[in-house]
Amino acid sequence: MSLKLMAFVCALLLLCTLTHVLSAATTVRPYKFGFTIDEQQHRAEKRDERGIIMGEFGFITADGIYHVTVYATDEEGKFRIISMKSYPYAGPVGSKSVPVTTTPKVLLPAAPVALPKYNFNSEACSGCFLKKSPPKTEIRTLSQPLAPVQPGKPDGSSDIGLNVQLPFRESIAQTVASRLGLLQDTLQTSNTNTNAPNTKTIELGLNIAMSTYYTTKNAVTGHVSTQTSNSQTPSANTKIDYNVGVVEKASPPVYRPLNIRLNEDVMRQAITYGNTIPGHVPLPNQPLVETSLLPASQVKIFALDGNAKVPLASNIQSVAQHPNAGLNAKVPLASNIQSVAQHPNAGLNAKVPLASNIQSVAQHPNAGLKNINRSGVSSAKTLANTKTRPPHTFNPHQTPLLSSATAPGISGVTANTPTGNVPSNGGGIAAGKAPGNPQAGGSGGIIGAGAPGGRKVSAGGIGSGSAIGGVSGGSKASGNGGAIGSGSAIGGGATGSKASGFGFGSNIGGGVSGSKPSGFGSESKIGGPDSGSKALGFGSGSKIGGGITGTKASGFGGEIGSGRGSASSATGDLYKFKYILDYNGHEETGGRNGDKQGSYFAIGEDAVQRTIEYIANEFGFQPHVSWRKLDAKEALPEENSLKHYEFKWFNQE
């Protein structure tokens, strides 16, 4: 009995113990916690004896908005969101000012609480840089709108886009007119003033060429509409209106097949004609004009008969020395001045030899000039082999070229000899000492020879001055060009010398690096050598003449395209753009030959302005980088606003 009672009591105690343990395991323990990260986020939560949890959390986004969410659970443990609020964050609350004493004093207002440092104004994002400036919602374009077209004002003068004058209009018109046989008269002579072709014939060829161009464009694109003004007006402007992107809901267009075949010979002739057009020399690059010793009233060319064909400026001296000569005769070139001066009785109807034939004429004064049939550009090799080259046609309004071989040229111009010694040449031009007094440059001298550096020499020639002369480094060449004007007729100096030459109106000139050339014509179309060279070059435009940098070659011009004198016939600027902002900018000028020149800059966060000046041509992109630390006084604006914008197309003159 007692054992059973003991067992029952033990079981009851065990049951009570288990019940207590189980009840202790399911007992709800209340808690409370919370934390706050200043100006970023906060969290708070608590649980009561019934097991209900209540809490909230909040965070500040990058746009300065405080988002607070309040949540709670019911007795069953289900999670519910009580409220969600968003309001601007104003920073922590400042402490109130408490008066020190109880004496009646006016309480000072509490100091305004400064806004926190990170009061950002931007859209919320994750991992992005925060901006202090308010977001910009307006649309700002860099380009300025075009001015509205006025109905009463013609739009032909606009130079925007493809409304510019096409550079190949003249070449196409000239080619078509030549194919039609309308320019036969202009191709007969090489150095005479001929009548320009009729305007109607040129306009006819121009209309044919432009109609071919537009027909080809329409056949290729199919959506280009052309507007051509009246073809009878000589100054009619032609414009092209591109309607690219305009979708028409009509039936699909049917394009005509391209059955136009271009003549390759015609295109080559057009390119050749375009290359003969000299380019305009910018005003800063034009050489200075030497003052003339003769007033305009004494220049005999202005007293000629009005019906006569006026010779070019390079023929002034020959006309002045032969006022009674027939004006219908072919006036010799500037290179023939000396031979004409030595043979005043020779008929001007004869073809006067070029500079390469001067010595042979001087040695045979009785030989008839009619037997010499050489014309164009003669070289020393051609003279040695007694071969002729076909005549070269010049533009009537273009200065004739004065050229010879690339071999050592006229004596007095040193070649490959820094001391001034002139090598022997087989071109028939006297080298070294000339007849007469070569050191003093007597009047009987044919072509003076230059002397070594340190001496002052006057080369003999026409009149009292020198016709052709030159000196080596350190010396000075001087002389009078006879009736042409002051200075020698043709002259050049090496590095460090002072060369004077080329009377007024002459288109021949040249100087080398370190020299001081003077006496060029009103518009010098013939460039000298490149920087650092000692080469002399004579020719038309920048295509002929010149020497390679660093060389000491001399001679008149050399062959066409020799040295670095050759360049594309397209000159002048094609476009220009420029835009400047507070922190960056870019400007560039593009030429018609493809060259580009400009600069751009950018200011970084380190207050350093980086500027890149560049030139891009056939040699590649050539930049020059520079840095500049901005001053503390140069306050940087908050916004990168546009200050200047410009874009312009240039018409071809």
UniProtKB/Swiss-Prot annotation:
Region (2 X 21 AA repeats): 307-348
Region: Disordered, residue numbers: 425-448
Sequence repeats: 307-327, 328-348, 433-455, 456-475, 476-497, 498-515, 516-533, 534-551, 552-568
Cross-referenced Pfam families: Chitin_bind_4
Any one of the GO CC terms: perinuclear region of cytoplasm
Residues annotated as domain Chitin-binding type R&R: 28-91, 572-640
A GO molecular-function descriptor: structural constituent of chitin-based larval cuticle
Region of interest (7 X approximate tandem repeats, Gly/Ser-rich), residue spans: 433-568
Composition-biased stretches (Gly residues): 439-448
Keyword terms, alphabetized: Cytoplasm, Repeat
Entry-linked InterPro entries: Cuticle_Struct_Prot, Insect_cuticle
Domain of life according to the entry: Eukaryota
GO biological process: chitin-based cuticle development
Tissue: Blood cells and other tissues.
Role summary: Required for differentiation of the phagocytic blood-cell type, the plasmatocyte.
Protein name, as recorded: Protein lethal(3)malignant blood neoplasm 1
Native source species: Drosophila melanogaster (Fruit fly)
Lineage, uppermost ranks: Eukaryota, Metazoa, Ecdysozoa, Arthropoda, Hexapoda
Gene of this entry: l(3)mbn
